């Protein structure tokens, strides 16, 4: 495909929001050693995508401009690089592109073989594209930070999941209920039925005084909180935690990181932990298998064509999507 062009969406610098996106034609990338070229069928947006555009980790990411954003994709392998052993052209796959290096809002993308997994015919491209960052963030929070076994074994845990109708929250509720848990979830009242259908035992409206205070309707103290919403002060979490309760914050800012450090330095029994997701192919493959078995699903808020990527971007920035926002080339 050398010399051939593809449609893509990129931005030329920090800031600008949806208006900063540009539709371009660029050369189709070539897979390097240990990489696969994927014809993209679905791209799932994450908050991280537009936060990078806003300069959240400048000057480290994006590494250079112009930059094609988005990393979580599903599609079909069309070409393999040197030393690729597990994939061949025609394979349907789910992948994370470029380890936060972007490239997703396009017709084709290159992924490392290590961050690519096979997608069975029972699992759609749109549904599986939500898994790499959002699904694995939920999985990592539950299994590594909380120590939950996803097979109903182990000690019972009371878990709170905030923003449970969002991209990460929806997966966290479903995965948590595979373990020995009682799950309390927060969301807006319009999403109560949805979140209950995902398995939540209790649902509270974050707009009510009780919801804002994270109070469990049954009066339970939380052994763990997976916080997927906007930052809250430690004083809101602390009284709701059990003796050794833990808060896992998936979108930590400077203040959250400071609080996390303080709870560690003071040897507090109640802890605030920040989570930076690590993408591993074996964990992604596990989530895809759960989907195939019908134990995990993706709630899709909306789908947009690549030509309307700005609308998808704006909706993601708005922050009120129910589930995942998907772009289809």
UniProtKB/Swiss-Prot annotation:
Chain ranges passing through the membrane: none
InterPro entries noted in UniProt: ADH-like_N, Chloroplast_QOR, GroES-like_sf, NAD(P)-bd_dom_sf, PKS_ER
Induction summary: Up-regulated by 2,6-dimethoxy-p-benzoquinone (DMBQ), 5-hydroxy-1,4-naphthoquinone (juglone), 2,6-dimethylbenzoquinone and menadione. Up-regulated by host root contact.
Domain of life of the organism encoding this protein: Eukaryota
Function: NADPH-dependent single-electron reducing quinone reductase. Involved in haustorium initiation in parasitic plants through redox cycling of exogenous haustorium-inducing factors. Can use 9,10-phenanthrenequinone (PAQ), 1,2-naphthoquinone, 5-hydroxy-1,4-naphthoquinone (juglone) and 2,6-dimethoxy-p-benzoquinone (DMBQ) as substrates, but has no activity with menadione, diamide, 2,3-dimethoxy-5-methyl-1,4-benzoquinone or 1,4-naphthoquinone.
A GO MF term: NADPH:quinone reductase activity
Signal sequence residues: none
UniProt-listed PANTHER family: ZINC-TYPE ALCOHOL DEHYDROGENASE-LIKE PROTEIN C16A3.02C
First-listed, main subcellular location of the protein, grouped into a coarse class: plastid
Activity: how regulated: Inhibited by dicumarol.
Family statement drawn from the similarity comment of this UniProt entry: Belongs to the zinc-containing alcohol dehydrogenase family. Quinone oxidoreductase subfamily.
Keyword match Isomerase: no
GO biological process, one term: alkaloid metabolic process
Protein name, as recorded: Quinone-oxidoreductase QR1, chloroplastic
Catalytic activities: 2 a quinone + NADPH + H(+) = 2 a 1,4-benzosemiquinone + NADP(+)
């Amino acid at each position: 495909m050398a010399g051939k062009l593809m449609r893509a969406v990129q931005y030329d610098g920090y800031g600008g929001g949806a208006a900063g996106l540009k539709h371009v034609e660029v050369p189709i990338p070539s897979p390097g050693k240990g990489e696969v070229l994927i014809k993209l069928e679905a791209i799932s947006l994450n908050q991280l995508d537009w936060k990078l555009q806003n300069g959240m980790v400048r000057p480290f990411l994006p590494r250079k401009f112009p930059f094609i954003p988005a990393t979580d994709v599903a599609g079909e392998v069309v070409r393999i690089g040197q030393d690729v052993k597990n994939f061949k052209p025609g394979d349907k796959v789910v992948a994370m592109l470029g380890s936060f290096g972007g490239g997703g809002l396009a017709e084709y993308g290159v992924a490392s073989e290590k961050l690519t997994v096979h997608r069975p015919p029972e699992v759609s491209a749109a549904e599986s594209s939500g898994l790499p960052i959002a699904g694995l963030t939920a999985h990592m929070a539950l299994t590594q930070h909380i120590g939950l076994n996803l097979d109903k074994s182990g000690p019972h845990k009371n878990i709170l999941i905030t923003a449970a109708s969002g991209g990460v929250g929806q997966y966290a509720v479903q995965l948590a209920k595979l373990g020995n848990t009682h799950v309390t979830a927060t969301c807006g009242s319009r999403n109560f039925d949805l979140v209950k259908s995902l398995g939540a035992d209790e649902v509270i409206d974050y707009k009510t005084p009780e919801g804002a205070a994270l109070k469990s309707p049954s009066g339970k103290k939380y052994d763990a909180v997976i916080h997927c919403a906007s930052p809250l002060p430690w004083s809101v979490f602390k009284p709701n935690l059990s003796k050794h309760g833990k808060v896992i914050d998936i979108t930590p800012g400077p203040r959250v990181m400071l609080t996390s450090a303080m709870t560690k330095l003071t040897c507090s029994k109640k802890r605030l932990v920040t989570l930076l997701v690590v993408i591993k192919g074996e964990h992604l493959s596990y989530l895809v298998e759960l989907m195939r078995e019908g134990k995990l699903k993706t709630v899709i808020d909306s789908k947009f064509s690549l030509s309307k990527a700005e609308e998808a971007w704006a909706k993601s920035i708005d922050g009120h999507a129910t589930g995942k926002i998907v772009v289809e080339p």
